[in-house]
């Protein structure tokens, strides 16, 4: 990908909070893990995101925790993800044909959006993973418990400039219960197509 961004957003009371707008402090743990924390005025309430590199595979394990923030409805926590694919080959048309958004419901085989046209899709089942694929490499978001079937959307838009291939979008939700601590566990796959 050329560029991208992602974040969690949710409502705290009647105010929308997006983790892309928060200030985080970082704490490194060994050589393979970093923990980011957004504090509040109450030290018992915070949001924490941990990233851990897998030393054997192409995975980055990610955990987002809301601690002590009980007025957030965890079912409304959305993971917003956008990427713009970079064109790397001389034969751009071939690249466009091999770039796409793939997804897999728990009870089904993998499926994909149009590789030639703009398409948006509301996912209608519990989804195991969503992947943004280019010619040789893929970036995927995987949830072992599955993303919620309530409200998720994915999309793809072919781009017309000579530098980029497509814009990829995903909005994913989680089936979580309210509690003193809410935890969202996922993993990224960042590696070659198999």
Describe the predicted segments one by one.
Residues 1-194:
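Soluble non-transmembrane domains of integral membrane proteins
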